[in-house]
């Protein structure tokens, strides 16, 4: 019936075999086919870029995205799993620029946009085969053949439909705004793209500049950390309520104005200056000053070169006075509020100065700092120069500094729908839950309008055509519409093709498309519609696939994909795009740094899989804090530990069962009975049925952490209690009902556990199932229904009894370990103290098991722990400090003097009076901290409501029995070393030894039974291994098969 199972398994090889089995038998396809026509469970797969290989950061969401669909399929749902590829955008273009050796907008245009886009199309799916191989090797079932690509014309057309819907609702507008801009990519970025990048500590020059007040010999001292913005200065800002001082600088003989609190930052000696007057910033409002550069003098008539009040000014840094240029969001807002100045941006696409700033023409802004400082110093405008250490954003694609500048861009009016966004967020089940009100909720509360246009080439073109004469705009929402407007056949929607599509307007002009392409995050957010070519196809079925039942990605997507899905879902349908989401944290290297090839601080993921197996890696990731959106410091040793402590014990349980089932020719019946008389059988079956309830509940709630914890607890109970305590039932030679019940129970437990584990570790579960399944069973474990609990076999009473016994056992083992008393050394007595009468009754029933487990001769059950210990007390300062005040010290001394009987009264609820002068205080149990002193030879430990004590006195008789148990253990180890089968009978060879002679006189029968030794023989020539029974007691043994 069952195949023989090797004790030592090569799990990576087993997994390769299972992959072949799945592939040869089309198991994934069959799992889908058998659910066709069933209720649909919708899962959206966030599209990755295929311009790089998957890493550990991809493995976490991909494991989660395998577990939930497998589980839902086993629950009877039809779950489409179509992979997607993000094929447009900056990541692709940047890779092509590196490949071609070109950089920036101008060089791309010279190379030719059509040629450039052809290269993008070639490179975009460079690693798709590697992705397929790695994702499938991880054990994830996903359909690559029916996957979508954002560059497909059907996908792009649906994105146009989404855009036009937002446009028609008044949610799309074009405007100048200060935006984060990537000089290397020559395009603006969205706020959440900035957050995807890194903020680095940088040392920038910090300047204090003198601005001369018009018609006066007085200077405003203004501060900046961006010298390159000074040529574009158009104003100065002060704080309305901040106090400023006009001082006379005795050394330079100049009158200066700065924040009163900042004078000491600029003058060490109070005698170096004289304060002329003090006033609020509001008195500076409207004062004119002389520009320090003459590049934009024409703006003077429009309100430039004046002082304005602003609410963001502080005296934390600088002078309390700030220079204003249209390169900061707040600066831009102040200029718009107080002036009519034009939008000034003397920078080209690569953030180099244009001819408008002729003295610094051609210099990249950051490189211009030095020359600008020299210029100001030469003309006596520089008052002070320092360095300023601060965090500055760098582009997430180029690792180059981001520049903030005024840009004409297309926006989604997010602020207009902010209330709806927050309402929609309330419908989403976030896992972990804190993200709803926390990171994601806060991001929505502070959401700004989304800049969706990119001045790039490889992307989905913004479908707006503008009349060259009147400026009239037409937004196009489909190919058909564009064909009707232009009279041309549309075969491709990319920029190099679509920009050629123009048509005459009625006003004598020409409709020409606006030059920008869409932010690729807009496409990702449109994925629910575009991947189904909605509404041009799948319109009737759309209500079944939107919103998604489930999605999963990393924490960074709270400001990426989760955000854009939510914006577009809310904008289109006032609904969430997804109902449930599991968010994982970052996977870092073991040193806490970002994983990097250049740092060489992580092992190649495929090497990990080929060493430990994908199941071990999956389990390691899912068990870790990363599933709760926390960071994980990845370690190969962590995966090794999972293999050792979980995967191998599962295999050992399976190996144990098959070994004895083969010997006894056990054959499972079709209708296996769960009605058992043995309490161990009843208990493990009850625990298994309870586990089913927990898993169905917790996975339905997307709580993978609780699910895994419950599974691991059961594996521990099965291996370390049920199997260990049932061994002799399998060993005995007669095939009675008890032995058959043990076989049936263990068979049912292992097989059912494998089905429960299948979504989590699909390989080992399949391997074990293939050997355990009967002719009536499904072809693959993954074609089974997910097990539901049989309430008739849940017995909470027996669970409580055995779990109490396990708790007492665990406490006793801890106590032994604490006092260096080996488990094989018998102890005369254990005392168990509990006031709970029900627990006392259960302990009486479980007494025999407990004594056997912890190797104790007698158990005494007590109601009061004072029979084992005497008490001392210390003051609980945390509690008493609030009540006693100055009397605390005196009362503390009195508490330390309390007698044992006084403390017992307090424990029993009788308050104890302490007098201090005329005051009386009454102590309760919360007011003291108990200390326990053990009586006589007792060693005591307390855990919650239970206290146990063991008698540590070891008599000679007990000591001899302990040596016997150690002797048996050493023989068993030798059996393993020699690869003897568990059922092999042996001859045991010993030397002439006084201690052994004493042991054999008392325990020969026990030794033979435990080691399957038929004969114990004195024979020096057969001795092979020296063993240590205890400290200096050595002997030599040998064994051979009979």
Curated annotation (Swiss-Prot):
Gene3D superfamilies: HUPs, Isoleucyl-tRNA Synthetase, Domain 1. The keyword Transferase does not apply. IleRS has two distinct active sites: one for aminoacylation and one for editing. The misactivated valine is translocated from the active site to the editing site, which sterically excludes the correctly activated isoleucine. The single editing site contains two valyl binding pockets, one specific for each substrate (Val-AMP or Val-tRNA(Ile)). Belongs to the class-I aminoacyl-tRNA synthetase family. IleS type 2 subfamily. A motif ('HIGH' region) lies at residues 48-58. It is found in: Cytoplasm. A motif ('KMSKS' region) lies at residues 594-598. Catalyzes the attachment of isoleucine to tRNA(Ile). As IleRS can inadvertently accommodate and process structurally similar amino acids such as valine, to avoid such errors it has two additional distinct tRNA(Ile)-dependent editing activities. One activity is designated as 'pretransfer' editing and involves the hydrolysis of activated Val-AMP. The other activity is designated 'posttransfer' editing and involves deacylation of mischarged Val-tRNA(Ile). ATP binds at residue 597. GO terms for molecular function: aminoacyl-tRNA deacylase activity; ATP binding; isoleucine-tRNA ligase activity; tRNA binding; zinc ion binding. One of its GO terms (biological process) is isoleucyl-tRNA aminoacylation. Its cofactor is Zn(2+). Monomer. This is Isoleucine--tRNA ligase. Its EC number is 6.1.1.5. The keyword Cell membrane does not apply. CDD domains: Anticodon_Ia_Ile_ABEc (cd07961), IleRS_core (cd00818). InterPro entries: aa-tRNA-synth_Ia, Anticodon_Ile_ABEc, Ile-tRNA-ligase, Ile-tRNA-ligase_type2, M/V/L/I-tRNA-synth_anticd-bd, Rossmann-like_a/b/a_fold, tRNAsynth_Ia_anticodon-bd, Val/Leu/Ile-tRNA-synth_edit. It catalyses: tRNA(Ile) + L-isoleucine + ATP = L-isoleucyl-tRNA(Ile) + AMP + diphosphate.
